[in-house]
């Protein structure tokens, strides 16, 4: 007979990689055109003036300026206030 118990197998021990979502540039921060403002799944934030939306719902700056968060028709929107 064995004096040591055989090592048991387990079906656990895995986890998926984080998606690194969230706001990347906050209100008042100055951004250049093309910079990512928000990484999101679905439209938690909607694009406003000077902001574009990618195929994965990522919001990015179309123009250089300061980031501004607000609401429009009950939706959270992100605008870019162009710099002088």
UniProtKB/Swiss-Prot annotation:
Protein name: Large ribosomal subunit protein bL27
GO BP, sorted A to Z: translation
Family: Belongs to the bacterial ribosomal protein bL27 family.
Region (Disordered): 1-24
Gene name of this polypeptide: rpmA
Gene Ontology CC: cytosolic large ribosomal subunit
First and last residue of the signal peptide: none
Keywords: Ribonucleoprotein, Ribosomal protein
Alphabetized InterPro entries for the sequence: Ribosomal_bL27 (IPR001684), Ribosomal_bL27_CS (IPR018261)
Molecular-function annotations in GO: structural constituent of ribosome
Any one Pfam family match given in the protein's UniProt record, by short name: Ribosomal_L27
Gene3D superfamilies: 2.40.50.100
Biased segments, Polar residues type: 9-20
């Amino acid at each position: 007979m064995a004096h040591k118990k055989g090592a048991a197998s387990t079906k656990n021990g895995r986890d998926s990689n984080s998606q690194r979502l969230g706001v990347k540039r906050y209100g008042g921060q100055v951004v250049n055109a093309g910079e990512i403002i928000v990484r999101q799944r679905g439209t938690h934030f909607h694009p406003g003036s000077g902001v574009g939306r990618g195929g994965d719902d990522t919001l990015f700056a179309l123009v250089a300026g300061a980031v501004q968060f607000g609401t429009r028709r009950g939706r959270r929107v992100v605008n870019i206030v162009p710099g002088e």
